[in-house]
């Protein structure tokens, strides 16, 4: 996940799903953004213009969850897409425990261990990398956009329920 993607259609439906899950199970859901600074990925990443699917803000999707919809409206402004600010202010913190530390290639293991400690009280953790599950473990910059298989195994060994989308 990158700040610039915050508030796109994927976030809208992800937040609806996590809020619903939290309410039905009567427990907070962990959300590990797999937050990445695009500068760490290189110049080509900085020049991408993907993640701009915000047409849902112009139609009647607001009826699904008006609170989430109103919070997403702010992110039409690119400059306001700051995950840390969002997680401090959103009503969703009642339902979701957000892990906001940025992952880096050189400190990935330390970052992951911090996430494990952070989610010690959550039974269910939603993993939100840019590109889904890696085919193999790697320490490359590009691997920051993926969940590593070893990370999933570790969470499972701790009896966590892991949810993520494969792209």
Name the predicted role of every residue range.
Residues 1-167:
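Class I S-adenosyl-L-methionine-dependent methyltransferase catalytic core
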């Amino acid at each position: 996940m990158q700040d610039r993607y915050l508030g796109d259609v994927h976030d809208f439906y992800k937040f609806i799903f996590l809020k619903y899950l939290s309410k039905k199970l009567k427990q907070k859901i962990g959300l590990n953004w797999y937050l990445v600074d695009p500068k760490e990925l290189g110049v080509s990443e900085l020049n991408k213009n993907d993640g701009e699917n915000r047409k849902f803000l112009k139609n009647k999707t607001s009826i699904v969850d008006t609170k989430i919809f109103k919070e997403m409206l702010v992110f039409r402004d690119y400059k306001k897409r700051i995950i840390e600010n969002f997680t401090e202010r959103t009503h969703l913190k009642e339902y979701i425990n957000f892990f906001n530390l940025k992952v880096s290639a050189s400190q990935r293991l330390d970052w992951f261990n911090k996430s494990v400690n952070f989610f010690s009280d959550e039974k269910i953790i939603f993993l939100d990398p840019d590109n889904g599950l890696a085919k193999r473990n790697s320490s490359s910059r590009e691997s920051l956009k993926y969940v590593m298989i070893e990370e999933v195994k570790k969470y499972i060994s701790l009896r966590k329920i892991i949810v993520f989308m494969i792209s």
